[in-house]
Swiss-Prot record:
The lineage of its organism: Eukaryota, Viridiplantae, Streptophyta, Embryophyta, Tracheophyta. It is found in: Plastid, Chloroplast thylakoid. It holds the Pfam family Sod_Fe_C. It comes from Arabidopsis thaliana (Mouse-ear cress). This is Superoxide dismutase [Fe] 2, chloroplastic. Residues 270-305 are annotated as: Disordered. Its cofactor is Fe cation.
Length: 305
């Protein structure tokens, strides 16, 4: 089990509307300014500024995943559940310090070291669902290629072994939640909460199970793939046959091209952050300085061995 979270306090962050998380050389989660707002926008209506997260449609027609995922499922899952998360989030953050932030920033700040603020569930579910829709495609499935396949074979033994472990994790994720393939480029684990610059062996693919709305962003992993194991994701098509839904998802729907693109971005991000950290590590962290550690979270998150 893994209990991790960001160290910064919400009171110091909510008044800095353009802050993004970055693993800096001072061995803890830092926050840096970024002038671009990703995912979230503000919309002017009749001269009044309102929170304006929009319900982004899946990148394909709603019937394009048939017969593996029905139009009816997407009508309910995207058109009702996902939509409700976005609408509720906009209501929750309107007029607060959070309504100037991107969706990812709202997720990270409202997680609040595991003591989630009211906006967290809707923000994370909105983010998770958008990521989920973009993880699948008509005619998906098959087998990845290139660097993604190489890392899967390195970290799991074989693609077939990865499939079995991912399916098992998703099937055994009790209740509502998500199962993820993520790129881990830090040293957060149960035995070592210290987070210095990662060594090469720390950079690896991991399978993670999270409950409810929690996702790997909150402890600074890079999500690559997710499957929604809330019942509303599959019940219309598969009833209580979760294992059949998981098999169909992995064999007929996964967009390995998208996962590969995400991996490229995750690796580039890790390299950039390591370079930035190396440049200032000696200055900010003399050898005799005691490294800071992450605080424990109240939320249990499972990383699959």
């Amino acid at each position: 089990m893994m209990n991790v979270a960001v160290t910064a306090t919400p009171s110091s962050l909510l008044y800095s509307p353009l802050l993004l998380p970055s693993q800096g050389p001072n061995r803890r989660m830092q926050w840096k300014r970024n002038g671009k707002r990703r995912l979230g926008t503000k919309v002017a209506v009749s001269g009044v500024i309102t929170a304006g997260f929009e319900l982004k449609p899946p990148p394909y027609p709603l019937d394009a995943l048939e017969p593996h995922m029905s139009r009816e499922t997407l009508d309910y899952h995207w058109g009702k559940h996902h939509k409700t998360y976005v609408e509720n989030l906009n209501k929750q953050i309107l007029g607060t310090d959070l309504d100037a932030l991107s969706l990812e920033e709202v997720v990270l700040l409202s997680y609040n070291k595991g003591n989630m603020l009211p906006a967290f569930n809707n923000a994370a579910q909105a983010w998770n669902h958008e990521f989920f829709w973009e993880s699948i495609q008509p005619g998906g499935g098959g087998k990845p290629t290139g660097e993604l396949l190489r890392l899967i074979e390195r970290d799991f033994g074989s693609f077939e072994e990865f499939l079995e472990r991912f399916k098992s994790a998703a099937a055994s994720n009790f209740g509502s939640g998500w199962t993820w393939l993520a790129y881990k480029a830090n040293r957060l684990d149960v035995a070592n909460a210290v987070n210095p610059l990662p060594k090469e062996e720390d950079k690896k693919l991991v399978i993670v199970k999270t409950p409810n709305a929690v996702n790997p962003l909150v402890w600074d992993y890079s999500p690559l793939l997710t499957i929604d194991t809330w019942e509303h994701a599959y019940y219309l098509d598969f009833e209580n046959r979760r294992a059949e839904y998981i098999n169909t998802f992995m064999e007929k729907l996964v967009s390995w091209e998208t996962v590969s693109t995400r991996l490229e971005s995750a690796i580039a991000r890790a390299v950039q952050r390591e370079q930035e950290g190396t440049e200032t590590e000696d200055e900010e962290n003399p050898d005799d300085e005691v490294p800071e550690v992450y605080l424990d979270s109240d939320i249990d998150v499972s990383e699959v061995d």
